[in-house]
Amino acid sequence: MKNGFSFVTLLSGIVASALTLSPSAVASSQESNIQQATQVVLLNHGLQLNYPQPVRLEQVLLDAQQQNRQQNGSSNAQALSFHEGFQLFNLNKQAETDALLLHVRQQLIELAKDEDYRQASQLLLTLLEKHQYGYRENINLDIDAVRLKADLNPALPGHYALKQASRENKVLLLGLIDQKTVPFSTDLDVADYIADSTLSNNGNKSEAWVIAPNGNSSKVGYSYWNNQHMSVLPGSTIFIGFNSSNDELQALESDIVKLLGMIKG
């Protein structure tokens, strides 16, 4: 034991299960969380941090930094310091992400029956099949911010996986567009990144989704008449959705964007 945790080799095939609580079980669940141990898989190193009781986020981030230094020295610790791209997956809630992915797949398969959207549906299905997804907690993983504000430093009962990141000087173009990786530049905005690409017939010609490295997303205008001149962070994804105001298509598009923000990168 060291600093309240132990390292064990991560075994392959970790299976996460999600718990569904009835209203009558909420109180007992909250009580059990007080005693529930914390396990955090460090995906960069194939190791697991074990804590005998719920641990605060700050401690997990500190221990992850320590492991970075032990693995490859200070250079590795500095490389894995792009906190905007850190990912904390809640393994107890994996079933929720699996259900969302299944729902999106079913929606796209149904949409493919419409000849006008067949090609678009196949493009998006192929995109989704390329990745694995986890339930990503929407939480600030900047250790300096976590130290300064108590409400950014929650206890973490249960099972988690942490992926640390280095800065990637690239931007991904995905969706109903020529899907490719382009170099990041501080001089470019969303419209600039899209300018040299070809959209599919159903691709949105005036709006795009920007998915930041932290998983947050926003829909912005990029055409000449509604250009918001939005810049992006390195490692961001620009997603082109449907050129339609149909409510069902908009909901499907939003679900796809949510999944893309939860890729286990």
Predicted regions and their residues:
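Ser/Thr/Pro/Gly-biased, low-complexity, turn-/loop-rich segments
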Residues: 2, 25-265
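Gram-negative bacterial Sec-dependent N-terminal signal peptides
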Residues: 1-29
